[in-house]
């Protein structure tokens, strides 16, 4: 029985940046540092930051006056930003720059009075933050998750209409939704390039290749990680059994019955240490060989805020 590791896999530039912001803030200012929502959706990462002194909260009313707060990689609404400013909280923004790019698209649409349609998953923090960039009461922003949702849209005119997407969606599903939107609203405008981020795209492409050569695909990632769920769904859609796991403790040995090659990948918020712990555990269950699938190389780096960057250089 062999393991085939997907490439690329694991941390993306936005996740690296978000974790660095929390770690540098703790190093410079000391504990506690408050973080609004899990800075990235991974239990192992969050528990590690908690151990260093990060305090994770869901709302700003849980943050004491004069405290430091970090916004998670998923971004926040304008309302949350304004509340932090009103209270005089010191803020470090760990919003992924690619999410910020979508925020700017929504804010521009709001300012121009253009109706906006966001393709995304209801209730996901990124979607909540993105929807919260739109405040034009005379137009509106609407959320769709599927092709079926388009028929329910309360939008009759295609004039002054635009769309954007959550950054961690299924490429295939999103393509279908965009096609259906353009069919119903031929004049609808959208971004020149898909809003789905490079890391999501690359990891989904790697899983396509992985599934072709595996009888089981294990995706290392937490249950609340959107991009990790999409990887598991993609492998299943290709006819290969797939399991989303937080780590080796989640593996059921019965999954390996009749399997010759186990494909392993990791969501963009899952650290490589978890992948390696899964590999080592599988070796105790009969794996004898480990190889890497060829894939694209990622060199993207996002800088941390200037105040933290200056300290980092020193």
UniProtKB/Swiss-Prot annotation:
Gene3D superfamilies from the UniProt entry: 3.40.50.11270, 4-hydroxy-3-methylbut-2-enyl diphosphate reductase, catalytic domain (3.40.1010.20)
Binding-site positions, (2E)-4-hydroxy-3-methylbut-2-enyl diphosphate: 41, 74, 124, 167, 225-227, 269
Catalysed reaction equations from the record: isopentenyl diphosphate + 2 oxidized [2Fe-2S]-[ferredoxin] + H2O = (2E)-4-hydroxy-3-methylbut-2-enyl diphosphate + 2 reduced [2Fe-2S]-[ferredoxin] + 2 H(+); dimethylallyl diphosphate + 2 oxidized [2Fe-2S]-[ferredoxin] + H2O = (2E)-4-hydroxy-3-methylbut-2-enyl diphosphate + 2 reduced [2Fe-2S]-[ferredoxin] + 2 H(+)
Active site: 126
Binding site for [4Fe-4S] cluster: 12, 96, 197
EC number: 1.17.7.4
Alphabetical keyword list: 4Fe-4S, Iron, Iron-sulfur, Isoprene biosynthesis, Metal-binding, Oxidoreductase
Pathway of action: Isoprenoid biosynthesis; dimethylallyl diphosphate biosynthesis; dimethylallyl diphosphate from (2E)-4-hydroxy-3-methylbutenyl diphosphate: step 1/1; Isoprenoid biosynthesis; isopentenyl diphosphate biosynthesis via DXP pathway; isopentenyl diphosphate from 1-deoxy-D-xylulose 5-phosphate: step 6/6
Example GO BP: terpenoid biosynthetic process
GO function term, MF aspect, one: 4-hydroxy-3-methylbut-2-enyl diphosphate reductase activity
InterPro entries documented for this protein: LytB/IspH
Cofactor binding note of this UniProt entry: Binds 1 [4Fe-4S] cluster per subunit.
Positions of dimethylallyl diphosphate binding: 41, 74, 124, 225-227, 269
Cofactor(s), names only, from the UniProt record: [4Fe-4S] cluster
Positions of isopentenyl diphosphate binding: 41, 74, 124, 225-227, 269
The protein's enzyme class: oxidoreductase
UniProt function note: Catalyzes the conversion of 1-hydroxy-2-methyl-2-(E)-butenyl 4-diphosphate (HMBPP) into a mixture of isopentenyl diphosphate (IPP) and dimethylallyl diphosphate (DMAPP). Acts in the terminal step of the DOXP/MEP pathway for isoprenoid precursor biosynthesis.
HAMAP family: IspH (MF_00191)
Family recorded in the similarity comment: Belongs to the IspH family.
Name under which the protein is recorded: 4-hydroxy-3-methylbut-2-enyl diphosphate reductase
